[in-house]
Amino acid sequence: MKIVGDSEHFKQPYDSNDEYVSKTEDKRDCEAAQKVGMELVSLSKTQLDKIELDEHLYDSIQQAHKIKPKTEAYRRHMQYIGKLMRNVDIEPIKASLAVVLNKNSNETAKLQMFEKMRERLLTQGDGEIQTVVEHYPQLDRQKLRTLVRQATKELAKGPESKSSKELFKYLRSEIQD
């Protein structure tokens, strides 16, 4: 009886020195590509224009904006976008996406900072005006004091006031951090 050892006949595809990718790994990669596609669909047109995409992929994302979410057609279209994403190098898209999303979070943080500053100005009065003017010397103290006074008077009458909005706009336009 002849014992057959490591013959070519018994070798499996994963026995070679090539890197073997399991089905599970392949599925994970496909799902990751589809998630990136979903993030791209959630962006606005101006944000999407900042990311360099394949023309066919860009058109598909634009079509996804026209389909109602939570429908079967939307789900199928998202799978199609995932399929297109598998044929494209995802890393540069992820990097561009991170830049676009980070810029948005920075903008939101700035607006929240102005909102908090306005609230402090309205609640603490002249002491806070002095602190803000010392920190941001480009602000006109007299105009700031006038806006705070008007907004405080209007807030006593009702919740949102025109002067309060003007104060916010003034802070946002004058402070460039």
From Swiss-Prot:
Entry-linked CDD domains: YjgA-like
GO biological process: assembly of large subunit precursor of preribosome
SUPFAM superfamilies the UniProt entry points to: PSPTO4464-like
Main location: cytoplasm
Taxonomic superkingdom: Bacteria
Gene Ontology molecular functions: ribosome binding; rRNA binding
Region (Disordered): 1-26
Basic and acidic residues bias locations: 1-12
Role this protein plays: Member of a network of 50S ribosomal subunit biogenesis factors which assembles along the 30S-50S interface, preventing incorrect 23S rRNA structures from forming. Promotes peptidyl transferase center (PTC) maturation.
Entry protein name: Dual-action ribosomal maturation protein DarP
Organism field: Shewanella oneidensis (strain ATCC 700550 / JCM 31522 / CIP 106686 / LMG 19005 / NCIMB 14063 / MR-1)
